Amino acid sequence: MIKEDNIEMHGIVLDTLPNTMFRVQLENGHKITAHISGKIRKNYIRILTGDKVTVELTPYDLSKGRIIFRSR
């Protein structure tokens, strides 16, 4: 199986949802639902409303993503 190319985009957290899900507005204006990656969860990095984050999207479903980095 070939690993697909993931799309990385920057966005701002708009809302916190249950089960460590977040509503994120991307730079291009789209709003997606994103969950936290395992490394962020393992290191107890806190993500709050208004934080700038880097989101990874798959080409298969552009409405869901994974938060892989929180900017300072």
Swiss-Prot record:
Chief location: cytoplasm
Top-level taxonomic group: Bacteria
Keywords: Cytoplasm, Initiation factor, Protein biosynthesis, RNA-binding, rRNA-binding
Location in the cell: Cytoplasm
A GO molecular-function annotation: ribosome binding
CDD domains xrefs: S1_IF1
Subunit and partners: Component of the 30S ribosomal translation pre-initiation complex which assembles on the 30S ribosome in the order IF-2 and IF-3, IF-1 and N-formylmethionyl-tRNA(fMet); mRNA recruitment can occur at any time during PIC assembly.
Designated name of the protein: Translation initiation factor IF-1
Gene for this chain: infA
